[in-house]
Regions:
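RNase H-like, Mg2+-dependent phosphodiesterase core
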Residues: 1-211
Length: 211
């Protein structure tokens, strides 16, 4: 295999919790120690958390966590999720390149690869960027997806504990119910500390919280 960096994110479709972007460098020397690494969506939460510990030990990596308050601030600035994602991907890639030179970066199919290229700094502008459909089949992208998911799960749990509650994943009816309970207990002004306010879920929560 050709040594390269994989990059992926977690929390993009979750109302509660941060947006996490991770990048991970994998070379032939790492493969033997990455057994069990595959797309994080196919793993249970405990296994993802366990694998992430091993990946961090074995591979040069970077994890960028954008908490809800910062996320909402950046989203208001960018007004576009793809620009925000490109910003996060670029930071993670640059951080890994600072630890380990590489000439190839693979990411999931990006809506606008040019936006990611534009956000990269000096080191990043020299690498080849490949966007792939179902990129999680690539070992480095799979490793990055596990790192991102593990960090998301850890921070979501910690965020809930700060407010004495459990914040569910996703954007389902269960999430709306939890959002309504949170607003009634903590007030609307604190929702931005735990949730992404541009989601349609936010409008559903506010409508029901009025009742």
């Amino acid at each position: 295999m050709h040594p390269h960096i994989g990059v992926d994110e977690s929390g993009k479709g979750d109302f509660f919790g941060p947006l996490v972007v991770a990048a991970c460098y994998v070379g032939p020397e790492h493969l033997a120690e990455l057994e069990g690494v595959k797309d994080s969506k196919k793993l249970t939460d405990p296994i993802a958390l366990k694998l992430a510990t091993n990946i961090k030990r074995v591979c040069p990596h970077a994890v960028i966590s954008i908490g809800p308050a910062k996320y909402n601030e950046l989203y208001n600035s960018f007004r576009n999720l793809n620009k925000l994602l490109a910003w996060g991907h670029a930071r993670a890639i640059e951080n890994v390149l600072g630890q380990q030179p590489a000439d190839l970066v693979i990411s999931d199919q990006f809506a606008n690869p040019a936006e990611l290229k534009r956000r990269l700094f000096e080191k990043g502008k020299t690498v080849e960027l490949q966007s792939m459909v179902r990129a999680e089949a690539d070992i480095a992208v799979a490793a990055a997806s596990i790192l991102a998911r593990a960090e998301f799960l850890t921070r979501l749990k910690r965020l809930g504990e700060e407010f004495g509650t459990t914040l569910p994943k996703g954007a389902s009816d269960l999430v709306i119910k939890a959002g309504v309970a949170f607003v009634r207990k903590e007030g609307q002004e604190k929702l931005g500390q735990v949730a992404k306010l541009h989601f349609k879920t936010f409008l559903n929560v506010m409508e029901l919280a009025k009742l």
